């Protein structure tokens, strides 16, 4: 058996990636989220495949086909809710994974980090297009509002929006192409995840201390396979608890109303995992400025390795940076809350303040604190 594992071309590749992979001996449970993201992606692809067997991407039948899945298809309701809440779990793991990378300085592995940012954008695009498919009120108006943002691009904006729509409004052509893209993108995400792992295994994993662990490595299996299994069990228990007890907790009630182009919902908002970016978008009165702030709020991750002025990789021994980091986390929670509130005072002011703080911490306060901590090291 060992010979096959180490000699067969395909088995050898799997062996080097998941079995005999040398891993640092001190990585904590924060390193579990990579494998949990892989599990989430598998759940999404499998449940999505079964949903696609019964779904019809036509404006006249899309809403009723989702109803049919929930009412008439064997276990259709659980497949649908696993898929919808699986997306929420995906983003929870994704935010934890990125947060871990920021805290422990994993962004110094440039290729891995940059592929990760591309993955984040791809997952966000996939989730957005998936939200449009049930063709409820929030699906339709969410698609209209978000795609309309592209019209802020000078000269070519309006033409670009109509090209994406396939007409002069969000209609059948839009729904059909969104379904096609929503189906193909998870497989592209899986391929990008392989590249992400490929680059990670070039450098080896980071560890909480942020110093080289070359002198103290242990095999990935059985130590970290067992450790990951605990994360898997916790994730599945959380997901099934959500699906079986309160499947609509994270959804929007407006999406149970069929899409009506003549009736605008009182508050148009995306799914909870986009609310932080949506709050930043809304905090700027100018349309183009808002779009630039929205893109910058995520693209700013690409700047972080270049703004890293500290002499230590990890924040483990940098208390001032830790304070700023947790301020940033609190700020993101505030933005998420504001994104779900109506556009009126005091929410407008809170949103604008939180948006300024977000960019201020990442672009100015973090690099300056790093330099200060470098000075304190010499004391």
Swiss-Prot record:
Q: Name one GO biological process term.
A: mitochondrial electron transport, ubiquinol to cytochrome c
Q: How is the cofactor bound?
A: Binds 2 heme b groups non-covalently.
Recorded GO molecular functions are:
metal ion binding; ubiquinol-cytochrome-c reductase activity
Disulfide bond annotation, renumbered to this chain: none
Q: What is its main location?
A: mitochondrion
The protein's required cofactors: heme b
State the signal peptide span. none
Supply one GO CC term from the record. mitochondrial inner membrane
**Binding positions for heme b b566 per the UniProt entry:** 97, 196
Residues recorded as binding heme b b562, renumbered to this chain, are: 83, 182
Provide the transmembrane region boundaries.
33-53, 77-98, 113-133, 178-198, 226-246, 288-308, 320-340, 347-367
Membrane topology field:
Multi-pass membrane protein
Going by the UniProt record, its keywords in alphabetical order are: Electron transport, Heme, Iron, Membrane, Metal-binding, Mitochondrion, Mitochondrion inner membrane, Respiratory chain, Transmembrane, Transmembrane helix, Transport, Ubiquinone
Which residues are noted in the entry as a ubiquinone-binding? 201
Listed CDD domains: cytochrome_b_C (cd00290), Cytochrome_b_N (cd00284)
Query: What does the UniProt entry say about where the protein is found?
Result: Mitochondrion inner membrane
Q: Could you describe the subunit structure of this protein?
A: The cytochrome bc1 complex contains 11 subunits: 3 respiratory subunits (MT-CYB, CYC1 and UQCRFS1), 2 core proteins (UQCRC1 and UQCRC2) and 6 low-molecular weight proteins (UQCRH/QCR6, UQCRB/QCR7, UQCRQ/QCR8, UQCR10/QCR9, UQCR11/QCR10 and a cleavage product of UQCRFS1). This cytochrome bc1 complex then forms a dimer.
| Family of this protein | Belongs to the cytochrome b family.
Q: What else does UniProt say about it?
A: Heme 1 (or BL or b562) is low-potential and absorbs at about 562 nm, and heme 2 (or BH or b566) is high-potential and absorbs at about 566 nm.
Role noted for this protein: Component of the ubiquinol-cytochrome c reductase complex (complex III or cytochrome b-c1 complex) that is part of the mitochondrial respiratory chain. The b-c1 complex mediates electron transfer from ubiquinol to cytochrome c. Contributes to the generation of a proton gradient across the mitochondrial membrane that is then used for ATP synthesis.
List the PANTHER family hit by this protein, alphabetically. Answer: CYTOCHROME B (PTHR19271:SF16)
This protein is called: Cytochrome b
Q: Which gene encodes it?
A: MT-CYB
